[in-house]
Amino acid sequence: MAKIIDARLRDNVHLLGELLGNTIRAQHGDQFFDKIERIRKGAKAARKGSAEGAQLLAETLDSLDESELLPMTRAFNQFLNLANIAEQYHQVRRRAAGEPAPFEIGVFADLIERLKAAGHDNEFIARQVSRLEIELVLTAHPTEVSRRTLIQKYDAIAQQLAARDHTDLSDAERASIELSLQRLIAEVWHTEEIRRNRPTPVEEAKWGFAAIENSLWKAVPNVLRQTDATLHRLTGLHLPLEAAPIRFASWMGGDRDGNPNVTAMVSREVLLTARWVAADLYLREIEGLITALSMREASDELLRQSGDSAEPYRVLLKPLRQRLRATREWARAAIEHGQPAPAEVLQDCAELRRPLELCYRSLHACGMGVIADGALLDCLRRLAVFGLFLVRLDIRQDAARHAAALAEITDYLGLGDYQQWDEQKRLDWLQHELANRRPLLPAHYHPSADTAEVLATCAVIAEAPAASLGSYVISMAHAASDVLAVQLLLKEAGLQRPMRVVPLFETLDDLNNAAPTIDRLLSLPGYRQRLHGPQEVMIGYSDSAKDAGTTAAAWAQYRAQEQLVEVCREHGVELLLFHGRGGTVGRGGGPAHAAILSQPPGSVAGRFRTTEQGEMIRFKFGLPDIAEQNLNLYLAAVLEATLLPPPPPEPGWRETMDRLAAEGVAAYRGVVREHPLFVDYFRQATPELELGRLPLGSRPAKRREGGVESLRAIPWIFAWTQTRLMLPAWLGWEQALHGALQRGEGERLAEMRARWPFFSTRIDMLEMVLAKADADIARRYDERLVQPELLSLGSDLRDRLSQVIEAVLSLTGQSDLLDHSPKTQEAFSLRNTYLDPLHLMQIELLARSRQRQGPAESPLEQALLVSVAGIAAGLRNTG
């Protein structure tokens, strides 16, 4: 294959690999390093079909004694991590003169030009941009495989690569940078990759806050500055100071669904920690502004507040500094001692914003606009986006927990068992109690521990400032009563204001019933008065795909959104769809820009809310420059989906998609649910059980005891990713596409792919995940780990993988997957040289681990866990 990847990227990867080699040699000697090189060269040759290479690889791996397994897995893991750093930096490195800018940089300006060409006037475009409401919800699972300590070192390596890119370096300066890189890589090598203990929910939340502090805090004002400049250049209008087209929310410390470690006290601590972090960040901003705004000239409006002073701006800003210090000190004291807030504590964003806006107006009025539009404007932009609370905390709980709490209450009150009531009886009682002025619970009521925790969570919500909270999400919602149940529990806790209570529909049946459920809800007397803003509905991608396969799940998600748009239109209510996407294709993941543009027409309408998952937060927002690129994509995609939506699909396309979905779900469930040996095969062929020992996040891997249905979507995906079968992302498509092609529907499929963004995006994401799949690697897991009676099932699944690859190639007209993207092909090829040895070592480690069942801290178990992390790094995803 001709070398397509940029020479500078190759140079950085080579340099980092060489420095890692120096570090390994220094600790383990030349002989050990030579084994690494033999394994790498053997893997590279074996990939090209060399029998000698395959033999060299096998012999060298067989020659490793047990003490060498851990450092060997660490070597390949760290090389893949370093390759990721080089790739990530390459995305944002300075471009040489004449080099084309990345797509992400110009996407917003290109869109404005297209909107104008489509007949939209300047005022309309500017107004739509200022009204955009995009909210990215940071979640903790799948939590980063990499430890936060290592992530900080990886970021420092990226900074040194940027420094090395300067063209005017002296030899001494270049040598100094390379010495710094050598030192950082040595620090990485001598730091354990795997946490000894699971993080607590509060630690997860702090990880999320760190992503904001280290990257998004800088990226957001830069993006809004660029957006404003583009808007002004192309329309003559500015983005208003108060505009916040992108905001952030979080599930870290609020998502208690299936996680007993997230309690009411944890959510309270996370809310206070967010206030502390926000106050600390703004304090640094204000101190910088006090230093910068030393000038005397000021408007009469400002002088009326500052009095006669040589430094009027400082007079206005110094009290803000004191109040931010007081807010920060109180937040810490409240976490430790539950101390009430003194009067000096900032409670409302306007208390901080008004003096800053006054300074801004005064500077412009006095001819100092260039000063106003610097750090002061950035601070105002941050304030509009992050507010006083940094992120809005969502609360999530399973509908069954609310029903159980109400059943306990109705039983205590002598009304019977709420859980046994039909839907109409539940609604009648809930409506009556919501309208009743008296409390539901008598003062002497003593709930069980589970019910007390539900009530305590509602009490924390009632006490927290409204602006610190996002939505209350009800997972596994089935009916209108699920929403009213939460509203009643919040009323009982003393909540006096409306809060968004959001049903999450996440199985195939629930997605199909989503629109009728919302229709019934909006028809209930009194419900509209309790509705806070738009009707928010969450679409579950992960669990619906695990339930029905991605073919049927994707179509059910699309149709549910179409129907919800229609229902809300009939009721005259605005709709906000909240997309619960994962990081992987099997959990609804994929490129955000394409995904947004493939939504049904009318479903975006200027609003878009979506989860950003664990490891994807680092890949998409870990470095400020990369965060800027991804935020640009969100802005452009949501604006385009709003003003240039795709046309509705043709009736014939719908019929074809109905058939594909029906055949897909039958094929998927025929294997996953109905094959009697599937669960045994899954547990033997993948490291699913071993993944439960990996301290990934605060949340247990299972909801309850049982088979595949009890597994959370993340370990389900993660396990198949490790073996490279990638089964959840494609199972069902092989039957659906093969059947359609056999029926002579190839032209129809090609037309759908060419003209329907929904279908083309699905096929593109399917192709990407198939390019990561590797039947030969999956076969090796089977041969070493699976009992003989289960081997035929593995063989059948690999045959199905071949079928779906053939179908996709037929549909795309390519000879090989990703022929249209040779750079991506080459990147995968380079990674396989380092992934193949990790897979082979993992297979051996799994076999030995299952024979011995040693303690988690033994070198064997540590090597196994490092292999898991390494494969995740090589494939750029976990679950």
Curated annotation (Swiss-Prot):
This is Phosphoenolpyruvate carboxylase. GO terms for cellular component: cytosol. PROSITE patterns: PEPCASE_1, PEPCASE_2. Gene3D superfamilies: Phosphoenolpyruvate/pyruvate domain. GO terms for molecular function: magnesium ion binding; phosphoenolpyruvate carboxylase activity. Its EC number is 4.1.1.31. It catalyses: oxaloacetate + phosphate = phosphoenolpyruvate + hydrogencarbonate. Its cofactor is Mg(2+). The active site is at H141, K546. Keywords: Carbon dioxide fixation, Lyase, Magnesium. Forms oxaloacetate, a four-carbon dicarboxylic acid source for the tricarboxylic acid cycle. GO terms for biological process: carbon fixation; oxaloacetate metabolic process; tricarboxylic acid cycle. Belongs to the PEPCase type 1 family. HAMAP family: PEPcase_type1 (MF_00595). The gene is ppc. InterPro entries: PEP_COase (IPR021135), PEP_COase_bac/pln-type (IPR022805), PEP_COase_Lys_AS (IPR018129), PEPCASE_His_AS (IPR033129), Pyrv/PenolPyrv_kinase-like_dom (IPR015813). The keyword Disulfide bond does not apply.
